[in-house]
From Swiss-Prot:
Function comment: Catalyzes the interconversion of L-alanine and D-alanine. May also act on other amino acids.
Binding site for substrate: 118, 292
Disulphide linkage map: none
Pathway recorded for this protein: Amino-acid biosynthesis; D-alanine biosynthesis; D-alanine from L-alanine: step 1/1
Cofactor: pyridoxal 5'-phosphate
EC number(s) per entry: 5.1.1.1
UniProt record similarity statement: Belongs to the alanine racemase family.
Record's protein name: Alanine racemase
Length: 337
């Protein structure tokens, strides 16, 4: 049976590095959406809670319910307001309609569109937003934005940061006008945390960095947490001239000992079609086309590490490490080691 092994020492190291850069554990909100980026939300939530993280963000209410006992506060990022919100959670408001559809008295964070144009209220909508917030008894606990290019060397980050600074000032003015408590503000994602040393927000909101993947530079000295392992199903000698797998994509030029391992694209891996060389963690190449539930390679023993750095697969498939990690099937066993 294939399995995902999570290095707990590496995870705690990453949390320590992030907390130190942010100015304390209390200033860190961990993003655990999509099964904690494929790592396993329940395991990661337990470890983060044990470390002392009190606040996390997830995609949906169903995700929040899975890890509710681990955190004091959970922000739901992608909820579509329906009037049936849970008072134990905090909900992101992604447009003006959400303010009128969400259950009265709900705890909310306003999303501010500072130039990404994906979700959020425009600056010009802020004053109008405070009407329904006040009238419907919504608890405005926070406001945030998302940087579209904090990992790129251009002016986008600085434009958005200035726009958010102006939005924060306007929100504070409106809080005074409507006699409401001041909310917390957050904007820095993993790349922004790595890139900049000064923060004028209350919290940072970190996703991929907790799992050991730097998005801008390696200043935090992060360590990958996840390694993917497959167990041997069978073994054989592939004779010179014989081919393995669908389409006979790999043919041996000499006798080699090969094995089939129990992991394939049905487990959430991008499908290797046998073109070029896709190295496993031991440096040996996958041989032939990947099957739905298995792949072949030179015999590496009872277990083989498929990867311990998602960047290797991301480079081969011309994608990003998020894409490799988040697709890993929730059916694969996960454990801390």
């Amino acid at each position: 049976m294939s399995e995902i092994r999570l290095n707990k020492k590496a995870y705690i190291h990453n949390l320590m590095q992030i907390s130190n850069k942010a100015g304390g554990k209390e200033r860190v909100m961990l993003v655990l959406k999509d099964n904690a980026y494929g790592h396993g939300a329940k395991l990661i939530a337990a470890a983060a809670s044990e470390f002392g993280i009190k606040f996390c963000a997830v995609k949906s209410q169903s995700e929040a319910l899975e890890i509710q006992r681990n955190f004091e506060k959970i922000l739901i990022l992608s909820h579509i307001a329906n009037g049936d919100e849970d008072q134990n959670f905090i909900y992101a408001i992604n447009d003006m309609k959400g303010l009128n559809r969400i259950k009265r008295g709900t705890r909310i964070h306003l999303v501010i569109d500072t130039n990404m144009h994906r979700n959020g209220l425009k600056f010009s909508e802020l004053e109008a937003a405070f009407g329904p917030i006040k009238e419907r008894g919504l608890a405005l606990e926070g406001a945030y934005t998302h940087f579209r290019a904090s990992d790129e060397m251009n002016a986008d980050y600085f434009v958005q940061r200035q726009n958010f600074k102006e939005a924060k000032a306007e929100i504070l003015r409106l809080c005074e006008k409507f006699a409401m408590p001041h909310p917390i503000f957050h904007s820095h994602n993993s790349a922004a945390l790595e890139r900049f040393g000064e923060f004028d927000d209350d919290m940072v909101r970190v996703g991929i960095a907790q799992h050991g993947y730097a998005q801008f530079d390696d200043s935090l000295n992060l360590k990958p947490v996840l390694s993917l392992w497959a167990q041997k199903v069978s073994e054989r000698v592939l004779k010179a001239g014989q081919c393995v797998g669908y389409g006979a994509k790999f043919c041996a030029d000499k006798d080699i000992n090969i094995a089939t391992y129990d992991l394939g694209y049905g487990d959430g891996l991008l499908r290797y079609a046998g073109d070029g060389e896709l190295p496993l963690a031991n440096g040996k190449a996958m041989l032939g086309k990947m099957s739905m539930d298995s792949f072949s390679c030179e015999d590496a023993g009872e277990w083989v590490c498929v990867f311990d750095d998602a960047n290797v697969w991301a480079r081969y498939f011309d994608t990003i490490n998020y894409d490799i990690l988040v697709k890993l099937s929730p059916n694969i066993k996960r454990k801390f080691v």
